[in-house]
């Protein structure tokens, strides 16, 4: 259901102008193909002699289906989900890393690709790490191949005549497929570099990467000249990216995923010359139940081992503890092995079932922690104590991150200073005793454990825990098998600290022993492995997720275990492997299209009585930042040719979309996000049909999972609402801006309904402010109370004439919406509203808060549970009072997504668990967190006084809280408690006379409040409107952070009010906002609304 728009560069055949209606139906533009419903688009274009780019898509799908049927015929099975993705890349001629778990057919795919290419007369080389694999592959290939396919292999133990046969065919290029070992690549570098292969498959990239010169050899084997490799390497050494010559068309290089991280910079040659990085399988797909047992009881351990019986790893904190456990369990006749003296032998015995239990030591790089991938055997992981990092707190030995944090907090070093550890220790000794230092650490590092007697800081090693527990749950034959992790931990502080970090990093929770049903868990563990052994239908799929922001794509891919990244034209694509297959993440980097500026009515054509918006790709000058839509090679402002054109982004998305089985557009959950979603969807529909929309309200694993459960198509009411807003902005903005520019002779001036209305408030408030100056006196009473009284007070006493006391329950404020967040955070932290909005955007995209553009105060049950969990953690569950606040609103209020406070986040930044958060981010997060927790806490019971006093013959009322009777939400948002009054006369200790304006000037915060109150603007535009007023020079901020109009701003507003008042009145602006809201809800026809807008500004246009 298209929305009657035209898009430049969207025709799938000529790349020209097409309608969204034709794109939705998969049709090229009318110039290429006037027909409305051809039975065969390719043939119709061919017959009209207008066939262009559509040939590529037609041939792509034909080639892919040919590969698929060939594979099925030869191998007897259809492609798996992983293999479908790889096949589509092969057909497109792309090099890549095969990132996938074991048992999904990587080697089979490499062989079948070589055989398929051989049919086309193309040459392939298959490289394996061992002679055994070379032999096995040769045998399999010869069984599968047709007689005409020439296959030769080489290994050292071959017969003499076979070697000679290989060498002859190799020298004469008389072969289709060659199979040899990594060692052969190293020894025959010169010969191989002279050959040109269409396809090179490397089965064990780790073995190849051991000798960095092998990388050059592989690149030359696919046709990249040595001179280009040298140039590329030289560029990479300078920290730059090498741009491969456009005329260079190399063959395809496919490598298996690495197990170790590639070292050095030479592997970056793959990135710059073949557009892929050597990825590692870092699957975070896990299905683990974590259980905590709150005592280190060996009897309990024995009881548990008798339930589990087999497939058990035990991690002790030290080798001594491990030996003690080993000897203890031997006494109970358990079949147990250790890993500190005979790792290889005992591990092999464990592998084949001769040993049931294996004991190792907790260590991040330990062999048992990282070097083991045996999900068929490892089912249960037991930790004898929490994996921890221990740091001395002696002033001579304390670690740098602890010293720096303490000294910065005390103001002894500046935030930007970076002294070395010895200098830090020296400063600490000069200003702190050992006892004071430990007390400071306790006060500041709340989420860790400080042992006074040992002067030791203990931080749970969450990454070691995640790595080691993950041995029990992996993808096995396409099935994510179940695992159980048990932690024996007595120390409550250490356990809570681990629990918090596990929730942040892996989004996994730990249950207590009482909640665990061991019998049921054992059944789930065994059943998942039985399922992996059965002959199952392959359910793996490839999925492409398109978001707006590269940060969001990066955050999501990291949560799901990013395995590799690559560049596709001008965008980055991240790849992750999950239990259901491969997920690709990429970003549009904001809007991809905008209204053209020339033609029609400011970019909107009128056809058959209907308005048709015309869009072109957005272009942005990388040098000066100017944005435009015209098709031109240089910036219209600074003439730079360094242009970022979203046409490239769209083309890249079309190419990537061909790889995936399913595409989900996950742009922001608002009207702007919906419009971007439609812009992308209509562009991709001609080349792929499996395309839907999801909304993510938080960037977490949970948020992603929940969004996947509510897949839908684009909401056209939201798209239409965005079009109406944009067209209204364009029409009124262009017309009024043109009048201003002409009147004042300045080309950078702008006007708009909301912008000009708000400017009017500021101008008028300035006038009211100037007229409102009055005398005031500040009285400081002997009981410590300050009273502000209008007028000049002569008396030296204040008499209490009436006094009442009452108990009252005070309820909390609701959680933040966009307007209340911008207003309060801007005010409290003295930040501009645009800066606050940018910080909120960062916190959302990095997965710390829910979506930040919202008018709703609603809190979901999941949100309420975040509050309950945190209150339980700090021992305050008794004050939990779950409130939904509202049942309305597509979004929730702004809230934290995890029960982790700002102090804990700060500690995790110091530990390196979190990156890219500044002090400002933490302060904003703290305000959001506290406001949210307050909103979910019980009412505060207070005692208040209602007092009437006589001052200079005038009576004034005072109401104040004098006592907190029962704590509640005030633990997060403190209340002011004032000194009590008694029924008597109080001396005035001090008087201060001053003049004060009774009408306050606006601040950025109060402008946003006013916009919300008067129904002007929207959550997504509040900050932007304020920012535009500053940028245009209409307003400025004085030293008290008050917003005031410039002389020029007053002139602009006076001119608009005098000449064009009806277009910029508050009433007109509010009425239009209401109409646009109705379009969003589907209650108003959007074409009729555009007609109404047009008729309203027609006279303005005709004025000239």
From Swiss-Prot:
Residues 715-1101 form the Topo IA-type catalytic domain. GO terms for molecular function: ATP binding; ATP hydrolysis activity; DNA binding; DNA topoisomerase type II (double strand cut, ATP-hydrolyzing) activity; reverse gyrase activity; zinc ion binding. The active site is at 851 (o-(5'-phospho-dna)-tyrosine intermediate). One of its GO terms (cellular component) is cytoplasm. This enzyme is the only unique feature of hyperthermophilic bacteria/archaea known and seems to be essential for adaptation to life at high temperatures. It may play a role in stabilization of DNA at high temperatures. PROSITE patterns: HELICASE_ATP_BIND_1, HELICASE_CTER, TOPO_IA_2, TOPRIM, ZF_RG_C, ZF_RG_N. Residues 300-522 form the Helicase C-terminal domain. Changing residue 106 to I: No positive supercoiling, no ATPase activity, binds and cleaves ssDNA. ATP binds at residues 83, 100-107. Its EC number is 5.6.2.-. It is found in: Cytoplasm. Zn(2+) 2 binds at residues 621, 624, 635, 638. ADP binds at residues 75, 78, 83, 103, 105-108. The zinc finger motif in the N-terminus is important for DNA binding, while conserved motifs in the helicase-like domain are important for ATP binding/hydrolysis as well as nucleotide specificity. Introduction of positive supercoils requires the cooperation of both domains. The helicase-like domain probably does not directly unwind DNA, but more likely acts by driving ATP-dependent conformational changes within the whole enzyme. It comes from the Bacteria. Residues 390-460 are annotated as: Latch region. Zn(2+) 1 binds at residues 11, 14, 29, 32. Changing residue 851 to F: No positive supercoiling, binds but does not cleave DNA. Very few structural changes from wild-type enzyme. Residues 223-250 are annotated as: Insert region. This is Reverse gyrase. It catalyses: ATP + H2O = ADP + phosphate + H(+). The keyword Ubl conjugation does not apply. The lineage of its organism: Bacteria, Thermotogati, Thermotogota, Thermotogae, Thermotogales. The keyword Chaperone does not apply. It is an enzyme of class 5 (isomerase). The gene is rgy. One of its GO terms (biological process) is DNA topological change.
């Amino acid at each position: 259901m298209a929305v009657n728009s035209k898009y430049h560069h969207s025709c799938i055949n000529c790349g020209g102008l097409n309608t969204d209606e034709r794109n939705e139906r998969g049709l090229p533009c009318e110039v290429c193909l006037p027909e409305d419903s051809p039975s065969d688009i390719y043939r119709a274009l061919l017959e009209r002699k207008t066939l262009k780019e559509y040939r590529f898509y037609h041939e792509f799908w034909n080639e892919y289906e040919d590969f698929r049927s060939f594979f099925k015929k030869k191998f007897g099975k259809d492609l798996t989900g992983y293999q479908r993705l790889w096949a589509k890349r092969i057909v497109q001629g792309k090099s890549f890393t095969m990132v996938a778990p074991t048992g999904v057919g990587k080697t089979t795919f490499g062989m079948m690709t070589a055989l398929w290419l051989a049919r086309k007369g193309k040459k392939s080389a298959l490289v394996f790490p061992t002679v055994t694999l070379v032999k096995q592959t040769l045998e399999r290939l010869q069984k599968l191949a047709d007689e005409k396919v020439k296959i030769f292999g080489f290994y050292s133990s071959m017969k003499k005549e076979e070697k000679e046969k290989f060498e002859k065919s190799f020298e004469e290029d008389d072969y289709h497929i060659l199979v040899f070992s990594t060692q052969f690549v190293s020894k025959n570098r010169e010969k191989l570099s002279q050959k040109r292969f269409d396809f090179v498959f490397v089965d064990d990239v780790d073995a190849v990467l051991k000798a960095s010169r092998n990388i050059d050899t592989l690149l030359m084997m696919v046709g990249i000249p040595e001179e280009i490799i040298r140039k590329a390497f030289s560029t990479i050494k300078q920290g730059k990216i090498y741009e491969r010559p456009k005329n260079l068309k190399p063959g395809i290089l496919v490598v298996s995923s690495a197990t170790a991280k590639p070292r050095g910079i030479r592997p970056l040659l793959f990135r710059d010359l073949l557009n892929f990085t050597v990825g590692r399988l870092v699957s975070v797909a896990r299905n683990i139940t974590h259980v905590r047992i709150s005592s280190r009881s060996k009897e309990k351990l024995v009881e548990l081992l008798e339930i589990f019986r087999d497939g058990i790893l035990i991690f002790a904190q030290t080798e001594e503890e491990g030996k003690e456990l080993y000897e203890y369990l031997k006494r109970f006749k358990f079949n147990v092995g250790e890993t500190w003296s005979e790792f290889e032998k005992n591990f092999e015995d464990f592998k084949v079932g001769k040993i049931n239990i294996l004991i190792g030591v907790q260590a991040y790089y330990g062999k048992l922690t990282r070097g083991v991938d045996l999900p068929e055997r490892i089912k249960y992981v037991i930790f004898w104590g929490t994996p921890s990092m221990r740091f001395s707190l002696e002033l001579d030995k304390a670690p740098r991150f602890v010293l720096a944090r303490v000294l910065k907090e005390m103001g002894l070093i500046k935030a930007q200073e970076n002294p070395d550890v010895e200098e830090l220790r020296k400063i600490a000794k000069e200003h702190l005793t050992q006892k004071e230092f430990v007390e400071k650490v306790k006060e500041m590092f709340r989420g860790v454990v400080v042992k006074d007697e040992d002067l030791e800081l203990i931080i749970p090693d969450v990454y070691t825990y995640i790595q080691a527990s993950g041995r029990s749950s992996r993808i096995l034959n396409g099935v994510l098998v179940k695992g159980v992790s048990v932690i024996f931990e007595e120390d409550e502080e250490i356990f809570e600290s681990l629990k918090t970090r596990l929730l942040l990093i892996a989004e996994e929770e730990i249950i207590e022993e009482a909640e665990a049903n061991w019998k049921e868990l054992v059944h789930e563990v065994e059943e998942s492995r039985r399922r992996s052994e059965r002959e199952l239908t392959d359910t793996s799929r490839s999925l492409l997720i398109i978001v707006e922001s590269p940060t969001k794509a990066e955050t999501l891919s990291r949560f799901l275990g990013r395995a590799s990244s690559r560049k596709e034209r001008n965008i980055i694509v991240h790849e992750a492997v999950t239990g259901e297959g491969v997920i690709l993440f990429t970003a549009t980097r904001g809007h991809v299209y905008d209204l053209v500026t020339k033609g029609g009515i400011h970019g909107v054509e009128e056809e058959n009585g209907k308005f048709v918006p015309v869009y072109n790709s957005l272009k942005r000058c990388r040098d000066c930042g100017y944005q435009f839509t015209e098709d031109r090679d240089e910036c219209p402002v600074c003439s730079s040719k360094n242009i970022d054109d979203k046409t490239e982004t769209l083309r890249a998305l079309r190419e990537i979309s061909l790889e995936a089985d399913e595409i989900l557009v996950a742009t922001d959950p608002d009207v702007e996000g919906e419009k971007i979603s439609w812009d992308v969807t209509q562009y991709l529909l001609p080349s792929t049909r499996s395309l839907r929309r999801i909304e993510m309200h938080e960037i977490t694993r949970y948020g992603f999972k929940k969004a996947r459960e509510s897949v839908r198509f684009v909401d056209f009411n939201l798209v239409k609402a965005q079009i109406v807003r944009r067209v209204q902005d364009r029409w009124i903005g262009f017309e009024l801006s043109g009048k201003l520019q002409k009147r004042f002779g300045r080309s950078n001036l702008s006007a708009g309904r909301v912008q000009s209305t708000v400017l009017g408030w500021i101008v008028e408030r300035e006038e009211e402010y100037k007229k409102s100056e009055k005398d005031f006196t500040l009285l400081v009473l002997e009981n410590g109370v300050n009273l502000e009284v209008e007028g000049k007070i002569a008396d030296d006493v204040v008499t209490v004439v009436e006094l009442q006391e009452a108990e009252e329950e005070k309820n909390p404020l609701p959680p933040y919406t966009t307007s209340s967040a911008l207003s309060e955070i801007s005010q409290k932290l003295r930040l501009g509203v645009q800066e606050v909005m940018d910080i909120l955007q960062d916190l959302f995209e990095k997965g710390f808060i829910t979506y930040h553009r919202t008018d709703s105060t609603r809190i979901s049950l999941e949100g309420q549970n975040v509050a309950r969990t945190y209150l339980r953690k700090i021992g305050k569950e008794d004050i939990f009072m779950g409130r939904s606040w509202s049942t309305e609103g597509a979004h929730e209020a702004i809230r934290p997504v995890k029960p982790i406070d700002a102090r804990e986040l700060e500690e995790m930044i110091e530990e390196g668990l979190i990156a890219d958060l500044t002090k400002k981010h933490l302060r904003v997060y703290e305000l959001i967190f506290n406001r949210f927790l307050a909103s979910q806490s019980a009412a505060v019971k207070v005692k208040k006084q209602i007092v009437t006093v006589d001052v200079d013959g005038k009576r004034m009322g005072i109401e104040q809280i004098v006592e907190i009777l029962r704590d509640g939400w005030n633990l997060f948002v403190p209340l002011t408690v004032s000194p009590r009054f008694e029924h008597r006369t109080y001396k005035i200790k001090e008087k201060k006379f001053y003049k004060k304006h009774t009408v306050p000037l606006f601040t950025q915060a109060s402008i946003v409040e006013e916009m919300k109150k008067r129904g002007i603007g929207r959550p997504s535009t509040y900050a932007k409107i304020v920012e535009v007023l500053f940028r245009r020079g209409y307003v400025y901020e004085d030293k008290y952070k008050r917003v005031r109009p410039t002389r020029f701003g007053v002139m602009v507003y006076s001119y608009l009010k005098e000449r064009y008042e009806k277009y910029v009145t508050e009433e007109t602006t509010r009425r239009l906002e209401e109409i646009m809201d109705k379009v969003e809800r589907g209650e108003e026809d959007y074409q009729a609304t555009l007609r109404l807008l047009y008729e309203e500004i027609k006279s303005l246009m005709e004025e000239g």
